[in-house]
UniProtKB/Swiss-Prot annotation:
The keyword rRNA-binding does not apply. Gene3D superfamilies: 3.40.50.1360, Winged helix-like DNA-binding domain superfamily/Winged helix DNA-binding domain. The lineage of its organism: Bacteria, Pseudomonadati, Pseudomonadota, Gammaproteobacteria, Pasteurellales. This is L-fucose operon activator. Transcriptional activator of the fuc operon. It comes from Haemophilus influenzae (strain ATCC 51907 / DSM 11121 / KW20 / Rd). SMART domains: DeoRC (SM01134), HTH_DEOR (SM00420). PROSITE patterns: HTH_DEOR_1, HTH_DEOR_2. Residues 1-56 form the HTH deoR-type domain. GO terms for biological process: fucose metabolic process; regulation of DNA-templated transcription.
Length: 249
C-alpha cells in the first residue's frame, strides 16, 4: 500500500466517513484521482464506497440480521404493512427499502400492475410469483447480513428513476423528530430513494418511538405519512401536526 492509500484510509477511519471533495482537499490531489483510489481500496475490502465518498469498514453497525428483525414485533409490522397497502394503485412505481416491515408490505401486496424498485433480496422473493408486478433491482454490493444491495451502483440507479412513492422503515425516531438508522450504507440508500420519490411513507412500530441509533437518516418533516400500530407520543404527534404529516394507525 502506498503513502496516499494509507493517508486516505487513515482519514476515512478517523472520521467514519468522508466525501470525495473532502479527501481531495486533504490529500491535495484531484477529485478524479481520489475516485480511482477509493474504488481500488473498496475492491480490496479496505473501505465501503458510497455515492460521493466512502465509509470506514470499521464503523460500528448497530443493525441486526434480517432474519432476526423479521420476527421482532411481527404482528405489529404485519398490521402496519396491511394498512399501508391502501397506498397502492395500478401502474404506480413504488420504492421499497430492505426493512422487515417493507418485506411484509411486499409479501401482502396484491398482484396488480405496478413496478417495485428495491434493493432487498427478500422483497424480490416475495414478489417473484406476482406476474403483474414488475420488479427493478438496484444492484450494487451485496450484504449477506442485510440480504440486500448497497453502494454507489444502487444509489446511481435511484438517481435516474422517478418513483411515485417510497415505503421504508428505520431504527428509531427521537423526541425532536429526527429519523435514525443503524448504519451509513442503509441511511445513504434510503436518502436516495426518498429523493427519487414524489412521496415518502414511514412504516414504524411503536417500539421505535423516541429511540435513536447510529446515523441520522433525515428529518421527519421529509415524510408525508407515518403508519404505525399505536398513537405517537404527544411531542411527536405535535411535531407531525406542525409539519402537516399524516398518521395512520
Amino acid at each position: 500500500m502506498n503513502y496516499r492509500d494509507e493517508l486516505i484510509l487513515q482519514w476515512v477511519n478517523q472520521q467514519g466517513k468522508a466525501s470525495v471533495i473532502e479527501l481531495a482537499q486533504h490529500c491535495d490531489i484531484s477529485v478524479e484521482t481520489i475516485r480511482r483510489d477509493l474504488n481500488k481500496l473498496a475492491n480490496k475490502g479496505l473501505l465501503h464506497r458510497t455515492h460521493g465518498g466512502a465509509v470506514s469498514n470499521k464503523t460500528k453497525d448497530l443493525g441486526s440480521f434480517f432474519q432476526t428483525r423479521k420476527h421482532i414485533n411481527a404482528t405489529a409490522k404485519r398490521h402496519i404493512a396491511q394498512k399501508a397497502l391502501d397506498l397502492l394503485y395500478e401502474n404506480a412505481v413504488i420504492g421499497l427499502d430492505a426493512s422487515s416491515t417493507s418485506w411484509y408490505f411486499a409479501y401482502l401486496m396484491p398482484d396488480i400492475p405496478c413496478t417495485v424498485v428495491t434493493n432487498s433480496m427478500f422483497n424480490i422473493n416475495a414478489l417473484v410469483n406476482k406476474s403483474n408486478v414488475k420488479t427493478i433491482v438496484t444492484g450494487g454490493v451485496y450484504s449477506a447480513k442485510y440480504e440486500a444491495f448497497y453502494g454507489p451502483l444502487s444509489e446511481y440507479l435511484l438517481q435516474r428513476l422517478h418513483i411515485n412513492f417510497s415505503v421504508f422503515s428505520c431504527s428509531g425516531i427521537d423526541k425532536n423528530g429526527n429519523i435514525w438508522e443503524s448504519n451509513e450504507l442503509n441511511a445513504s440508500l434510503k436518502r436516495k430513494m426518498m429523493e427519487a420519490s414524489e412521496r415518502a411513507y414511514l412504516l414504524i412500530d411503536s417500539s421505535k418511538f423516541e429511540k435513536t441509533s447510529l446515523i441520522q437518516l433525515a428529518d421527519l418533516s421529509k415524510i408525508n405519512t407515518i403508519f404505525s400500530d399505536r398513537s405517537l407520543p404527544d411531542n411527536l404527534q405535535k411535531y407531525c401536526e406542525q409539519h402537516d404529516i399524516m398518521t395512520v394507525l
